[in-house]
C-alpha cells in the first residue's frame, strides 16, 4: 500500500513538478484534495522555517503526514538575495514572476559576478517527527530571458554544466536536475528506507 502524503502547496506548477518526480512512489494529496483553502503564512526568515510553518500547520490541523517546501534563488553578488523573498521580490501583493525577474535583472546590471544557486528546503512531518531535506543547484543569471517552459526565474537561470536556461531545457530535463528534484529525491530515499 502506498503511503499517503499531503504536499502543502497551492502552487499548481510545484505540484505538477513534484508529482512528476515522485511518480508512483507515494499517493500525493494536494491542499485541495484535503479541502484546505487556508493561505498558510510564510513569515519565517529562512526557507527551512517557511517549509516547517506549512507542514506543521497541516499536521496540527488535519492530522495528516505532510511535507512542504520553500525555494529561494540566492545570488552571490546580491548577498544571497532574493533568497527567502524570491516569490515576492518585486514587492506588492501576490507573486509576480515577471516583475521579480525584471527587478533581479535590473539589480544585476553592470555586475560581472552573476553566480547564483536555487535552494529548496523540504520539511516533512511524519508521525509527529520533523525531517529536513535540501537540494541545491548552482548556476548563473543571464542578462535576458530565454525559453518558454517552467516558471519563476527559470527563463534567466542557467544551471552549471548547461548552456540553456531551465525554461529552455524543458520540464523533463529540469525535473531530473533541479534543486527541487534533488530535495524530493532525498525525501523519496528517506521514505523508502523506513
Swiss-Prot record:
Pfam families with a match to the protein in the record: Ham1p_like
- Enzyme Commission number(s): 3.6.1.66
Q: GO biological process annotations for this chain's record?
A: nucleotide metabolic process; purine nucleoside triphosphate catabolic process
Q: Which residues form the signal peptide?
A: none
Cofactor binding: number and manner: Binds 1 Mg(2+) ion per subunit.
Q: Which domain of life is it from?
A: Bacteria
Q: Which reaction does it catalyse?
A: XTP + H2O = XMP + diphosphate + H(+); dITP + H2O = dIMP + diphosphate + H(+); ITP + H2O = IMP + diphosphate + H(+)
Cross-referenced Gene3D superfamilies: 3.90.950.10
What Gene Ontology cellular component terms go with this record?
A: cytosol
Binding locations of Mg(2+): 70
User: Is Magnesium there in the keyword field?
Assistant: yes
Instruction: Fetch the InterPro entries from UniProt.
Output: dITP/XTP_pyrophosphatase (IPR020922), ITPase-like_fam (IPR029001), RdgB/HAM1 (IPR002637)
Specify whether Hydrolase is a keyword of the entry: yes
- Keyword vocabulary terms for this entry: Hydrolase, Magnesium, Metal-binding, Nucleotide metabolism, Nucleotide-binding
Sequence positions that bind substrate: 9-14, 71, 151-154, 174, 179-180
Locate the active site: 70 (proton acceptor)
- Molecular function GO labels: dITP diphosphatase activity; ITP diphosphatase activity; metal ion binding; nucleotide binding; ribonucleoside triphosphate phosphatase activity; XTP diphosphatase activity
The protein's required cofactor(s) are namely: Mg(2+)
Q: What class of enzyme is it?
A: hydrolase
What does this gene product do? Pyrophosphatase that catalyzes the hydrolysis of nucleoside triphosphates to their monophosphate derivatives, with a high preference for the non-canonical purine nucleotides XTP (xanthosine triphosphate), dITP (deoxyinosine triphosphate) and ITP. Seems to function as a house-cleaning enzyme that removes non-canonical purine nucleotides from the nucleotide pool, thus preventing their incorporation into DNA/RNA and avoiding chromosomal lesions.
Q: Which family does it belong to?
A: Belongs to the HAM1 NTPase family.
**Description of how the protein assembles with itself and partners:** Homodimer.
PANTHER family from the entry? INOSINE TRIPHOSPHATE PYROPHOSPHATASE, INOSINE TRIPHOSPHATE PYROPHOSPHATASE/HAM1 PROTEIN
What protein name is recorded for this chain?
dITP/XTP pyrophosphatase
